[in-house]
């Protein structure tokens, strides 16, 4: 079975070795046919602490690392222009 991957934007990096990634998915409403955007936040493991807020990242599913953390940082796709 292939590993699940998601692309999202880092919204928080205040925890040690953990980032919060916002992933948006678009779908069509079954009755009204309006395009809706669903946003979900995932906790991901960032071993080296290389991510900053606003970075676009690729995360992969992995074994449970804690109660809510089941994703790991695969790579940083683009760095944010915001400097913290």
UniProtKB/Swiss-Prot annotation:
Family of the protein in this entry: Belongs to the universal ribosomal protein uS17 family.
InterPro entries, alphabetized: NA-bd_OB-fold, Ribosomal_uS17, Ribosomal_uS17_bact/chlr, Ribosomal_uS17_CS
Matching PROSITE patterns: RIBOSOMAL_S17
GO cellular component, one term: ribonucleoprotein complex
Keywords assigned: Chloroplast, Plastid, Ribonucleoprotein, Ribosomal protein, RNA-binding, rRNA-binding
Gene from which the chain derives: rps17
Organism: Trieres chinensis (Marine centric diatom)
Protein name according to UniProt: Small ribosomal subunit protein uS17c
Signal sequence range: none
Record-linked Gene3D superfamilies: Nucleic acid-binding proteins
GO molecular function, one term: rRNA binding
Disulphide connectivity of cysteines: none
Source organism superkingdom: Eukaryota
Function: One of the primary rRNA binding proteins, it binds specifically to the 5'-end of 16S ribosomal RNA.
Annotated compartments: Plastid, Chloroplast
Biological process, per Gene Ontology: translation
Record text on subunit structure and interactions: Part of the 30S ribosomal subunit.
